[in-house]
Amino acid sequence: MPRLAAKLLLVPLLAVMLALPAQAECYVDYKAKQDDPLRLAYGVSQVSDAVCGKPKQAKAELAPRLAADGWTLLKILSSFGPEGLSERKESAGDFYLRY
């Protein structure tokens, strides 16, 4: 009987372990600015799954990437999966998955 119980527990455990490597993709859309002259931008970037749905953490991850090119991240607007990419591509223009 203990072997049967162990096998019954092993099946769900294996299912969970196999599912772990398949992580979802996470993206955010944001607003940023550059000074002198003032430029405003709307963009879309990929962020780590760990910050998905957490605007403050996503901002902390994305801000340094933008700052490297002289941009200041103003706001994370939303986070979404790959299904939301196509509807934002045109609006983001040059800032689509740039950072």
Enumerate the language-model features and the residues they cover.
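Terminus-proximal functional modules
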Residues: P2-Y99
